[in-house]
């Protein structure tokens, strides 16, 4: 299957047929998240043979999709929740991807040294879950942990849209917390202050969810 014809239906079919039972809530988030998040756009940003990392990788859903629908040379996931790391390792150990992979715990503030080896780093709907007092430090630390030439793909929910409250309700139901979303422009300002060049930026509403995506190069 080529990336040009990738559809949400392809992604959902793949997830339903590959994911083991991970609990009711986790299963909903894993198998049906592509309906409300622009995964097809994000997957197609990966270039052949890139070393790819996903920060806040959860149970490995997005990296599994990259192993199926893209052609990275390696996949690395970083996560603060050991239960989710176990989910991801169990998943990848039972599905032969033919791609080198690694899942690691981190403390949510200090990024592993291996991040400096990555060509492309994804941060997908994670930033608004970072504690408010730590968000700017988190973002600056992330920027300093990228190697020259690496690209950061930053996807989150736009606080400048009144529809942000639908995402807050979503997070209460599925995460048990209220996130702290930022406007896209605020994120761009921080990235530029840290010396990154913005090469792509766009907003996209899916149902009631006001997404934005930024691609920035170190």
Segments from the language model and where they lie:
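Class I SAM-dependent methyltransferase Rossmann-like catalytic core
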Residues: 15-36
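C-terminal alpha-helical "lid/dimerization" subdomain adjacent to the S-adenosyl-L-methionine
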Residues: 153-194, 198-206
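Conserved class I S-adenosyl-L-methionine
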Residues: 50-58
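Class I SAM-dependent methyltransferase SAM/SAH-binding core
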Residues: 61, 65-110
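Conserved alpha-helix/loop element of class I SAM-dependent methyltransferases that forms part
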Residues: 32-48
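A short glycine-rich, Lys/Arg-flanked "PGG" loop and its adjoining helix->strand segment in the class I
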Residues: 136-148
